């Protein structure tokens, strides 16, 4: 029986890609490097700031760490400019909360940024856990962080529904023994979600209630 719902943040709860793109392109400009389009960033993001920077600098890996630091410094103060919840997300969260499910966010975004975005856009939700990337915990798809969240929630992994928009999320859910649900309103396509093991794929937040019989 499902007792908790765990959400990825970027591309799942919130459309953050423009703010992420602007922040990384700002960092790249500071280093005289070319930027990327928003559409391209949809395939660069998802695996944490360190990996994003390595991908963004192309063959200038010697600048990756400096670009990462510049990106994070800028994004910390510019992560609420254009970002917004996806249509139907607030209503879905309200209904899940009414039905008594434990709710959590687990992101590869730095922990402080994760907490800031969630607190700003979802103040009405009584989250049980909100956690981003912290030192000593491998990024998704390693299951360590997801399992730690389940432990705090006091539920078994197979009692957790995990919603995400990328293969990283689906693989993390599978690695942790949770139930992966792919969402189509985020950054990636249906084929990627199916190929990475999504048990269910939904096109609108309200579908979660019928797809998983919550």
Positions of PLM-derived features:
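N-terminal helical cap/lid subdomain that shapes the substrate entry/recognition surface
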Residues: 2-94, 99-101, 110, 124
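Hydrophobic, well-ordered secondary-structure segments
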Residues: 27, 70-81, 104, 134-138, ...
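Asp-based, Mg2+/Mn2+-dependent phosphohydrolase catalytic module
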Residues: 1-3, 39, 110-111, 115-214
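Short, surface-exposed connector motifs at secondary-structure boundaries
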Residues: 95-102, 156-157, 174
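Generic enzyme active-site microenvironment
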Residues: 6-8, 106, 163
């Amino acid at each position: 029986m499902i007792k908790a719902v765990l959400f990825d943040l970027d591309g799942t709860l919130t459309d953050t890609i423009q703010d992420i793109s602007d922040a990384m392109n700002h960092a790249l400009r500071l280093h005289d490097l070319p930027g990327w389009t928003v559409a391209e960033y949809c395939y660069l993001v998802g695996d944490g700031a360190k990996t994003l920077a390595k991908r963004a600098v192309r063959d200038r890996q010697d600048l990756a760490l400096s670009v990462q630091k510049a990106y994070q410094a800028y994004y910390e103060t510019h992560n609420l400019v254009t970002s917004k919840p996806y249509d139907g997300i607030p209503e879905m969260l309200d209904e899940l909360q009414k039905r008594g499910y434990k709710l959590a966010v687990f992101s590869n975004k730095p922990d402080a940024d994760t907490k800031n975005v969630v607190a700003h856009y979802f103040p009405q939700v009584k989250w049980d856990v909100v956690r981003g990337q912290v030192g000593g915990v491998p990024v998704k798809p390693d299951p360590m962080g997801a399992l730690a969240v389940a432990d705090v929630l006091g539920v078994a992994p197979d009692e957790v529904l995990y919603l995400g928009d990328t293969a990283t999320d689906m693989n993390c859910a599978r690695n942790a023994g949770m139930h992966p649900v792919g969402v189509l309103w985020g950054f990636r396509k249906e084929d990627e979600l199916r190929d990475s093991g999504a048990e269910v794929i939904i096109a609108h937040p309200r579908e979660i209630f019928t797809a998983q019989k919550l």
